[in-house]
């Protein structure tokens, strides 16, 4: 009989010489400041940032949502370490002017902190 076990997820660590953002709940690294696209976004619980790429983040199933800027297919994202929902990933934008968001990530400010090198 073969016993199946859940595989351990290994946490990614971002370079310590760069400014980065971490999960406020568990301090897992989430994104480098260099991957920040915009600070002018609104999440479901307040202000949010748009990032080009993230680490230590899992993605739920995509669903269509009517957001402030129109209809989008989005998937909730969560911290792979503590499983807190952080924001969402834009899978598809239905309006031409919003296509730049596809494949990008929203993280709400209430779920992240500035970490390392923010003097």
Curated annotation (Swiss-Prot):
Kindly list the cysteine pairs connected by disulfide bridges: none
Q: Where is the Yippee domain?
A: 19-116
| Keyword S-adenosyl-L-methionine attached | no
Q: Which GO terms describe its biological process?
A: apoptotic process
Q: Which Pfam family, just one, is annotated for this protein? A: Yippee-Mis18
Keyword terms = Apoptosis, Metal-binding, Nucleus, Zinc
* Gene Ontology MF terms: metal ion binding
Q: Per the similarity annotation, which family is this?
A: Belongs to the yippee family.
> Which PANTHER family does this UniProt record tie to the protein?
PROTEIN YIPPEE-LIKE CG15309-RELATED
Functional note:
May be involved in proliferation and apoptosis in myeloid precursor cells.
Query: What organism is the protein native to?
Result: Oryzias latipes (Japanese rice fish)
Q: Which GO terms describe its cellular component?
A: nucleolus
Q: Please list the residues that bind Zn(2+).
A: 23, 26, 79, 82
Superkingdom to which the source organism belongs: Eukaryota
Asked if the record carries the keyword Zinc, the reply is: yes
Q: Where in the cell is it found?
A: Nucleus, Nucleolus
Q: What is this protein called?
A: Protein yippee-like 3
């Amino acid at each position: 009989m073969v016993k199946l076990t859940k595989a351990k997820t290994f946490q990614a660590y971002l370079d310590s010489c760069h400014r980065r953002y971490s999960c406020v709940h568990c301090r897992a690294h989430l994104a480098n400041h260099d991957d920040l696209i915009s600070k002018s976004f609104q999440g479901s619980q307040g202000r949010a940032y748009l990032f080009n790429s993230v680490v230590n983040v899992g993605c739920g199933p995509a669903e269509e949502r009517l957001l402030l800027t129109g209809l989008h297919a989005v998937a909730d994202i969560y911290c792979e370490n503590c499983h807190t929902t952080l924001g969402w990933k834009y899978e598809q934008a239905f309006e031409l002017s919003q296509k730049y968001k596809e494949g990008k990530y929203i993280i709400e400010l209430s779920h992240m902190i500035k970490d390392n090198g923010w003097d």
